[in-house]
Each structure stands twice: as structure tokens, then as C-alpha cells.
Amino acid sequence: MLLNDIISGKLVDSVYIIAEIGQNHQGCVETAKKMIWEAKKAGCHCVKFQKSDLPAKFTRSALDREYISDHAWGKTYGEHKEYLEFSKDQYLQLQAHCKELNVDFTASAMDERSLEFLSALNVPFIKIGSGDANNFPLLKKAANLNLPLVISTGMQTMQTVERIVQTMRESGKEDYALMHCVSSYPTDPKDCSLQLISVLRTRFPNVAIGYSGHELGVIISQAAVLLGARIVERHFTLDKSQKGSDHRCSLEPQELKALTTAITNFKLSSVPMPPQEIVKKLNGDEELEAALQHVESKTILPCELPCRNKLGKSIVAARNLNKGYRLQLADMAIKVSEPSGLTAEDFLDLVGKELADNIGEDEPILGNSIIN
């Protein structure tokens, strides 16, 4: 598979292109099949979905909250998400359809149960989305699978990315890639921070670096390739005007085709092109220049905070816990919580800590719930 050769470093002049269907299928298998065909025609190597086990990913309060939005598919957030989830049989249908069309099929594992589900499907690789990039229990479990990993790094600091790489190294995992990503939908060009691709390539020379973009248009994604990204992922839709929050920052078929054609025509090497030359080559404007502005290091950007606040994961109680109890691993879970609690990154640090309050099952563990 092309992705394996890119991750291993055997190929430096090829790009693996992923069409992120996500949940833009509107909960319809036939629409998903049509999207797979359109992505194949556009020249993509892979189509990717998003797999969630809702009770494993969200707390009950997060699922039960009222969801008022023009994009809602249900009265509660749980009903909305359930409408967009495919069953195992439906995933098998889509996987078989991809096999017929000779296009890779996979999904993001949004929780540990979904990771197990995708592993059992024997997908060619598993994606770990930005919302789980600091979910180290999930990352460790994924690293122990005999499957390549593609890990997005939106909403994370460079310190967290370094910890991801350390986690992979400690697990003996070599077949993985890191994706530069900004979790803002759509991403303003000035926030795209494309130079982080070069920063990541320099910091982690033995790791394949890719780009997961949420900007409008295709020129910034083309620039990412010229900077050294060898995996490109873009959200894909049949129609940007459709109901659903991801459609606006997705590419329609003709845009996706334009992107794959441009990338295929690039003559690539292991040496990234300087930003000034990229702007000239692509006939870029001020927006491309803004996307290519100098960046010192990776931080959580202000534009990412809405997504982080909505979908960032917290540490919650896996069962009812009493005041004075000292936490063990089995007492905690990592979920999207309403309200939010301590971040997933703190999970292992809480082992042995004493609770200052009673905490009910599925309730978030807050900073003031811990006696330091």
C-alpha cells in the first residue's frame, strides 16, 4: 500500500490523498457509496469515515443536552449523533464497496470501543483525530495494534506532540504518521500555520508528516505538499450547501479533482520548497502568504478553542467514587463531558490522588476535586 511506503520513508516523491467523508453522508449508506465513487473518480487513494461508540465517547449529560442548531438531526445531541452513526453491517457494506472500487477504506477511532471495532474490520490503517491526540490511554492501545496509525495534532501544543512521539517510541511503534492540523472550521489562512510542517519534519525526521486541512479552497493544501506533507486529508462533500456543520469547509468533487491533479503533477523531492518559491509557483496571493508566515512552535490557537471546548475530552468517573478515595486507573474514563473536567492528558497523573468530593459515575473530575 502506498501509505506504508510513505510512512516507512521508501517513497519521498508520492502523496497519499484521503477524502474525509466523515459524517457528510447525512446518515445515508447510499449517499456514502456515491461519495466513495466520486472520491475515487477524483483520484483519492482512501476514503475515511468517523466511528464512535456514543456511550464510550460521550457522558450521559453530553448526550442528553438539548441540541438547537440548523444542523441538528435530533432534539438532543445524542439523537443527533445517533442519526449519523452507521451500524456494523453498514460499515461492512461500505468496506466491500471500497474493495470493488479499489480504494482504501478506514475511519477515525473516536474511542476505545471504536478502535477495537475498526481493528476487527482489518482496515489498512487507523486514524486518531485531533480530539484524541492527548488521549494517551487510547494512543497506547492503538500503538499496540498491528496497524499503521495516522495521528492528527490539532488543538495540541508541541509538548503534547513530543509526548505522542515518545509514546509511540516506548510502544515500539514505527509505522505511524503525524498530521499538521488546525481545528477550526473553516480555517482562516492566517491560522493555517503551514510552516509547522517544516518544524515537525525537522523535529521528528524519522516520522512521516502530513496535512489535514480545513481551509476553503485547495491552494493551501497544495502548498502543504510542496513544504513536505506526504499525506493530505481534506473533508469531502457532494454539496457544500447541505445540512451539517462540516460541509462548508469540505471540498466538492470538482475541487477535490483539482487538488489531486495538481499534487500528481508536482515533481517532489525530499527537500521542501522555500515559501517564497511556493507562492510564485502557485501564483499565490496574500492569503497564501499568510498561510506560509513564519511559525516558531506549535501552540493551541485561539481559533481552536471553540472546537476544543465542544469536543475536547475530559477525565470522568467510571463509577461512583467517594470523598477520600485514592484514584486507580479503572476508576476513570476519558470522554467528551458536559461540563468539562481535567483534560485527558492528565489521566495517568491522577493515579493515587485523593478525592476531595464525592463524584458520581460519568461525572467529570475537576481540578478542585483532587487533593494535591
UniProtKB/Swiss-Prot annotation:
Catalytic activity reads: aldehydo-N-acetyl-D-mannosamine 6-phosphate + phosphoenolpyruvate + H2O = N-acetylneuraminate 9-phosphate + phosphate; aldehydo-D-mannose 6-phosphate + phosphoenolpyruvate + H2O = 3-deoxy-D-glycero-beta-D-galacto-non-2-ulopyranosonate 9-phosphate + phosphate
| Name of the top EC class for this enzyme | transferase
- Does the keyword Secreted belong to this entry? no
| Bridged cysteine pairs (disulfide) | none
Identify the keywords attached in UniProt to this record, alphabetized: Transferase
Report any Pfam family annotated for this entry.
Answer: NeuB
Q: Which domain of life is it from?
A: Eukaryota
Q: Indicate what this protein is called per its UniProt record.
A: N-acetylneuraminate-9-phosphate synthase
- Name its species: Drosophila melanogaster (Fruit fly)
